[in-house]
Regions:
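Non-catalytic cap/lid and distal C-terminal segments of serine-dependent acyl enzymes
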Residues: 57-97, 102-582
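Bacterial N-terminal signal peptides
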Residues: 8-19
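N-terminal secretory signal peptides that target proteins for export/translocation
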Residues: 1-4
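Contiguous beta-strand segments within globular domains
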Residues: 28-38, 44-52, 206-212, 231
């Protein structure tokens, strides 16, 4: 669920302090409207997309990198543009929806660090007959603030006073975000990219799937060995995550992790990344293929690895096109008993979904801190019974539902705030953020071709017909119970679920419901493992021996030995369990 901020987004502007001070002292005045345009040099043709006005009080980094869920966030206001011509301004006024302030008229008069940005859309002619305008992924993992090709303005100090009656203040989008270079290959890390016929047919244009493959030690020296495959699910990986082939940098300046309350966490990450390399290449570590896939959609950095009315057949594309290609190219065993999956958060949901929707293709799923696996607890909302997602039902009170909490239970964002942030960034579920992708994955397509909302994004009113669709198609707990007669013999003993009881996004609530369902399954029993971390936050993964900050860096060392145990317990007779054991 949680997407970490891009490290490069934290820009050091110390060298520009004199310029910033001068700009601040001479800040021009603006009212409550801005005229945002781009020059012909950036595009000679009209553009579609979302114009964002970003307003901040902090000039140490660009405003586009300062929009967040928590109290530290700055301001964003957005409007859609269709066919915006070069040189023609788009007017961002008090009518533009904003977050966390809903309108520019609500800004207190003062000096602000201001920037404009255009998140560009392209037109898709889908196989279902719908024509939609969406932001394509450009190799960045669906992040509008750093998407190659997006246009933006140089930040500047501006005095904003909504009381002023002056012409819209001009902002020129004369900067463009550059392409992202491809990752390097090494002896152990390879990269593949294939065109998916299934997805290309759905989207009406070429669509590609990518993957990073971590090759086992001795791969070249054992040409006849065939290996088990581990699908490590998670958000869009730039390369194999948590992997480093050189010793930690002794000169690395220590950072400070607010999330884990640790100084020098960047040094810890390097240490454990190098430790993985040493373990992986050392004697005795199981020899397997680890695969991390890139499957961004126009709605998010990740498709959730299932077939979907709005994203297309990503589940089948991964399982019928990408995985067989990798197994053929890298000598995978290519049978369900020798495939496994694990992941945390989004990856946790995907791991469980892969085992449920493709029960014969995997021999075990290790599911850490999963996104909601039972929609009776869609974080803190029961979409089948509640009428409003943002507030508790009450005749007299308007108690907001929490959306995020810290390690002490302090609420840092409400559900309404989280959804209004997305609504400011984009209309029609195109923000590329968390709640919009859940909706894109789980919902049917609406009459306009965009995901049918589970609730009114502005008010929180739940659409029960959409909730019913979600239950039948993607409520993993419900589907297990409904289809246990056929699923039971194929997933018995294969589900391992872990979550912290202080999960920052309340994901433990859905696990409680799912555990009750799993315990009640009979003929055969589920034999599922469900474990909880006391006082553990997002994303606890079942390690009772290490703090969360450390255990999240050790997924492969934790789960691959457990995979070996599963192979010993559950494999067909007369299969190759020896060639890869060296």
């Amino acid at each position: 669920m949680l997407r970490c901020s891009w490290p490069g987004a934290v820009l050091c502007l110390v060298a520009f302090v004199p310029v910033l001070v001068a700009q601040e002292s001479k800040a021009p005045a603006a009212g409550a409207s801005f005229a945002v345009s781009f020059p012909r040099e950036r595009s000679a043709t009209p553009l579609d997309g979302r114009v964002l006005l970003l307003v901040s009080t902090d000039s140490t980094k660009e405003p586009r990198f300062q929009i967040a869920d928590g109290p530290e966030t700055q301001l964003v206001f957005g409007i859609d543009v269709d066919g915006l011509a070069p040189g023609k301004p788009a007017i961002v006024s008090t009518a533009a929806f904003g977050y966390p302030l809903k309108s520019l008229r609500d800004i207190q008069p003062g000096r602000y660090w201001v920037q404009g940005l255009l998140n560009r859309y392209e037109t898709y002619h889908r196989a279902d007959g719908h024509v939609v305008k969406l932001p394509p992924d450009m190799g960045e993992g669906q992040h509008w603030e750093r998407k190659p090709g997006n246009l933006y303005s140089t930040p500047r100090w501006i005095r904003i006073d909504p009381r002023l009656r002056v012409p819209p203040f001009p902002l020129k989008l004369d900067q463009v975000i550059p392409p992202i270079p491809p990752p390097a290959e090494t002896k152990y890390v390879n990269h593949v990219r294939i065109q998916s016929e299934l997805l290309s047919r759905f989207w009406g244009r070429p669509v590609y799937l990518g993957a990073h493959i971590l090759l086992p030690e001795g791969f070249d020296d054992h040409p006849h060995a065939r290996y088990p495959l581990v699908l490590s699910h998670g958000h869009f990986p730039e390369s194999i995550e948590g992997w480093r082939e050189t010793p930690p940098d002794p000169n690395l300046a220590p950072d400070s992790s607010a999330r884990f309350r640790l100084k020098g966490y960047n040094r810890i990450q390097e240490q454990y990344a190098y430790r993985l390399f040493k373990d992986w290449t050392g004697p005795g570590f199981p020899r397997v293929l680890v695969v991390e896939i890139q499957h961004p959609t126009p709605y998010y950095d990740d498709s959730y690895a299932v077939n979907s009315a709005n994203n297309g057949p990503y589940g089948d594309a991964i399982m019928k096109e990408l995985v067989p290609y990798i197994e053929q190219k890298y000598r995978g065993i290519g049978q369900g008993w020798a495939r496994f999956t694990y992941g945390g958060s989004t990856g946790g949901w995907e791991a469980m979904a892969a085992q449920v929707f493709y029960p014969d293709d995997f021999n075990g799923a290790w599911v850490a801190c999963p996104d909601p696996i039972d929609f009776r607890a869609y974080t803190v909302v029961n979409i089948y019974q509640d009428t409003n997602a943002y507030r508790l039902a009450s005749r007299w009170k308007r108690t907001p539902r929490p959306g995020q909490r810290d390690w002490l239970g302090q609420v840092t964002a409400t559900l309404e705030e989280l959804n209004h942030k997305e609504l400011a960034i984009a209309s029609r579920g195109r923000s590329g953020e968390q709640w919009d992708i859940w909706q894109a994955v789980f919902s049917p397509a609406g009459d306009d071709g965009y995901p049918k909302p589970i609730w009114n994004k502005l008010t929180g009113k739940i659409d029960r017909s959409v909730a019913d669709y979600w239950r039948e198609h993607y409520d993993l707990s419900y589907i297990l119970q409904r289809d246990w007669k056929t699923l039971g013999p194929r997933v018995r003993g294969k589900l391992h679920i872990y979550v912290g009881e202080a999960d920052n996004y309340y994901l433990n609530d859905a696990v409680y419901f799912a555990e009750d369902v799993l315990k009640g399954l009979k003929d055969p029993p589920a034999d599922a493992e469900v474990d909880y971390g006391a006082r553990a936050e997002h994303c606890w993964n079942g390690d009772h021996t290490q703090p969360n900050a450390i255990s999240r860096l050790r997924y492969h060392q934790m789960f691959i030995p457990r995979i070996m145990d599963q192979i010993r317990k559950n494999h067909p007779p007369d299969v190759d369990t020896l060639s890869w054991r060296y």
